[in-house]
Amino acid sequence: PPTQNSSPPQTTGAAVPFPAGISAQATGMPGLVALNRVRVTGFTQSDREVVARAENLDTGEHLEIACAYLVGCDGARSGIRRQIGARLHGDPIVQRVQSTVIRAPGLLPLIPGEPAWANFSLNPRRTGNMYAIDGRETWLIHNYLTPTETDFDDVDRDTCIRLILGVGPAFEYETIGTEDWIGRRLVADRFRDRRVFLCGDAAHIWVPMAGYGMNAGIADATNLSWQLAGVLEGWASPSILDAYEAERQPITDQVSRFAMDHAIALAAQRGAVPDSIEAPGPAGDAVRAQVGHAAYELNVNQYCCGGLNFGPFYDTSPIITHDGQTAPGYTMSDFTPSTVPGCRVPHLWLRDGRSLYDALGPGFTLLRRDRSVEVDGLVTAAAHRGVPLAVLDLDADDAETLYPHNLLLARPDQHVAWRGDQVPADPLALIDLIRGAASPFDALQPGFTE
């Protein structure tokens, strides 16, 4: 269904050149050095730093890179994960897939209906998906192996591609790249070892579904980055970093189960395609309509997945003020906006046309629904601890509907840290909790002042 009216707006699909764009953006950022063709071979860490050992793959030069913290974003085969002793747990085999990128200028005119980013091919002999890479001639073909096909070498790639595309031996295409892979549901039992952290596929692996893995990796990085920034800038206690694993590990386990359950449902549908789907005439038309409708109903939730993107909440976090109210549940496609601490800050459009998310500050933001509520005590407490805090008055039509309390404290990652109708009696205690220094010992650590 259309998602342009959702709040916040959602998009589907990510192009193959996406990583190149990210790389170009990163190389232009001040203070960031990108080392391409450099492989990290190991690291050592002490109480004060991490020293990564690396090798330039072109020159053979060996490098040592000293840093305060190291974040392993090195993918499913993560060497960082192995070195910190983290183990993957879950389901090692969910689906075997034979993937091929092809160039086929003659394919698009053969596809009925309006051009689509994704086409699902279901027939009794072979099922698979076709994804448009450039919208013209480059395609990604997924061939889903049957449960009895356990050896990729025994599956003829060309024959399967032609069965999925519905073309004969005369149809011409060029193979650009191939990859045989196994969809899994695995989550690391730890995301951290002292100064070393795991993010993205290094921490969790599941069947690729509508970018869930990419979104989860971005959420990992967003969560960890603001906490690291607080420590490095001096306003957060190092104890705040304990929140990363406490918050992200349960969420990635939940999302991994959504992805696996959906993959199992898709496999069941692929294994039950009736022979009559290719029958001519009204009888065949009826079967095709029925199978097509079932495929739509199953997959629309996969691609219109607002629930997985905006529904997860942190209910076991040590740096959130839980007030006893339970966060609403979510499904793959649906969620209920909520200000329960730990939830994503409910989105709304401000009267000046801005998205609320664009108006939030780079640090914490105190959202005030009622301008008459005094907030100086909390602002002063934040300044006393050096915590970056901005105040934003909610000038929006639906603020009272979405925000039942006068005040809400939004974290840098857009999750609710606290809510109330007035500033708490001890605002300094609240500030210490959200910066990971709730205990007196943490509050008096070097770099923090009373």
Model-inferred region functions:
Residues 1-286, 444-450:
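Core Rossmann-like FAD-binding/catalytic domain of the broad FAD-dependent monooxygenase superfamily
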Residues 1-6, 24-31, 45, 163, ...:
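Helical substrate-recognition/capping region of FAD-dependent monooxygenase/halogenase enzymes
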